[in-house]
Amino acid sequence: MSYIVNLTGNRTSKDGSIMGKVHDFKEEMALHEQSELNVYRKHPQLTACDRRVTVYNRHTQQKVQAIMFGSNSYLGATIFPEAIQKAIEVTKEFGIGSGGVPLLTGTSIYQEELEKLIAKISGMDDTILFSSGYTANLGVISGLIRPNNLIIHDKLDHASLLDGTVMSGAKMIRYKHGDINDLERLLKDNSPQYPNGILVVTDGVFSMDGDIAKLPQILEITRKYDAILLVDEAHAIGVIGDKGAGTLSHYGITDRKNIILTGTLSKAIGTVGGYITASQDVIDYLRIYARSNMFSTSLPPSVCAAAIEVIKVMQSTEIVEHLKQNAEYLQNKLKSEGFNIMNTETPIIP
C-alpha cells in the first residue's frame, strides 16, 4: 500500500474549508507514519553540519552516524574557524541581534561592509541585505514590477521568484528550460505590448538539476528587446566563477548594464540571509520599495561579520577550485558505477 503524501504548495481540502486541508494532511500523515518512507521532518542533527554528522532518528529513537551528502553548505563554511571566532567576538561586542530595521536602527558597520564586499565581487555598485534569499527575491520583483509589466521565467526558476511575481501582479509567462529560441520567441511576440517593461528571470545555477543558465545568449537576447535581466545566484555564489564570484564571472561577462543579481548567504557562505546587488540607482530605489527589506529586522552583526570572513577565505584560497575537483571526482565515480547524474555542471547531483 502506498502512503505517498502530497507535499506541493497547492493543497485543497475535501470540503473546501480553510482548516479542512490541515485535517486532511493530519490523516495522511497518520498513514505515512506507518510506512518506512518517513519523509516528514523527524531526524534533527545533533552535531554541526560537517562531513560526518550525528542525527537522531525519532522513528527508531536511535542516534545515527552519517556522511553528509544532503547539505547546501558547499564549502563547509558553517564550521570555518575564522568565521566562528569572528562571530563570537562580534556577538560579545554587539549582542545577538541587530535591534531594528535597516532604515532606522538596524544597520551595523558589518552590514555595510558586507554589502560593499558582495557588490565588489559581483561587479556591481551596491547591495541590500535581506533576512533570506527568499525574501530578497520577493523584494526585488514586487518592488520593481507592476501589473502593467511582463515577467518571463525559465520553466525551472525557484519558487521564491515565482512568488515574487505573484505579489507584483504582473503577467507571467515561462519559456522551456534553457531553451534560448523559446525565450526569443516570447520576447519577440510580447515586446511590442510591453515596451521597456519586460523582466527576464533565471536561476544562475538551477538548484534541482545543477545546470548553469546560458547567460551570454540570454543576455544578448534580453538586451536586443530592451528587457531587464534578473539572475538568482543562490547556488552560484561561492560555487562557480573566479574565486566563487558567480555566473557572470563564470562566463567572463563584464558589462553589468540592465542586470540585477540576487543571492543567499545560507548556502556556500554558510550563514543566513540574502541580498540584491545591482546598479546604485536600483539599490537606492529598492531600499525604500522592497518591502521585505524595509519592514524586516536587519541581520545580526555577528552573521554579517562571519559572512565577511567566509568571503575572505573564498577570495584568498583555492577552496572553490577544491570544491570543483571534489564534485567532479564524485560524479565520475557515480557515472562509472552506472548512475545517471543527468546534465549537472556543478556540485549539485540530481
Range-by-range predicted roles:
Residues M1-T12, V22, K26-F94:
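N-terminal "arm"/small-domain region of PLP-dependent enzymes with the aminotransferase-like
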Residues S73, I173, H177-V231:
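Active-site phosphate-binding strand-loop segment of PLP-dependent enzymes
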Residues K324-E328, K335-P350:
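Conserved PLP-binding catalytic core of the aspartate aminotransferase-like
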